[in-house]
Amino acid sequence: MTTFSMTVTGSLPMREYVPIAQQAEQYGFDEIHVSDDLIMRPAWPILTLMATHTARVKLGPFIVTPQVANPVYHAANLAALDELSNGRMVCGLGRGGFNQMLGVAKAVKPVRALKEAYLLMEHVLAAKTEPFDGEFFQATADLKFQFPAPRRIPIFIGTWGPQMARMAGGVASGIKADCIGSGAYLSKLRNEMLAGAIEAGRDPSSVKLIVGPLSSIADDRAGAEDCIRGMLALIQPFLAPMTTEAGLDPEAIDAAYRAYVSGDLVRAKALVPQKAIRAFTLTGTPRDVIEQVEELIAAGADHVSFGTPTGPDPARAMHLVGTQVLPHFRRN
């Protein structure tokens, strides 16, 4: 059965996260993913609130990055929250989207570095006693948590790139591929992930594919599309190589972005083509979105995560997904 989750960002007042988590649990979402963006409220305190006010839904940061903090720090937070939530934590680990703000202009050996970060998290969560000696990360034999980490917590690699997907298939629980609405592109990533699992001698069925499209759901399609166009105008420049795969014009992408950052939202939205909405998002009425989700499942998605901005009215969007979209897939 397909797993369903929703993704929230750190853009909201802290008081709003508990009711959101409780509503998501009531609607039957399986998981809630919290973005850990450098310039917004961090995921860990939000997840702490959610863990103490829910009982069933799984929770996790998607994604944390070793560019912001050492993998051991992320692993310690993850283990502590797994204890608090009675074993409900999951996690995403990736390169991060704001590295340039930290002076990281170009990553060095990004696939190898992220693999090491993953392996170090696994190392300390498993309470291994030997040293960890990597090219990018090290830990002495003395580095071990002074509290129990009772289980192997699922950790997914956040990526929409083929090389990272192949690496993840060899070591991780799977991948989370955000901003993908295209079944064709998703199928390519899945093939890379499964190839990585086979190369590593793993059972391919043991690695899972989470897809996290940007989402805008409303009672009318026009309102949903208007909402998502602004988001796309802002983030399209950061979606390579998927923009090339989708056949989008680089000059139009740049023009939409410049219009957005200059405050001309009307022009920015007008410059976002329909095929961008189709390539990166789940957008429209519940009926529209059901058809799009079915395409992603047919392409190999094990788990669909409804991403931001959710819709012009986020509460209404959650209601529509919870009362119309999820029940459709639970029945089938």
Residue ranges: model-predicted function:
Residues 1-332:
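Active-site-adjacent structural elements that line small-molecule/cofactor binding pockets in enzymes
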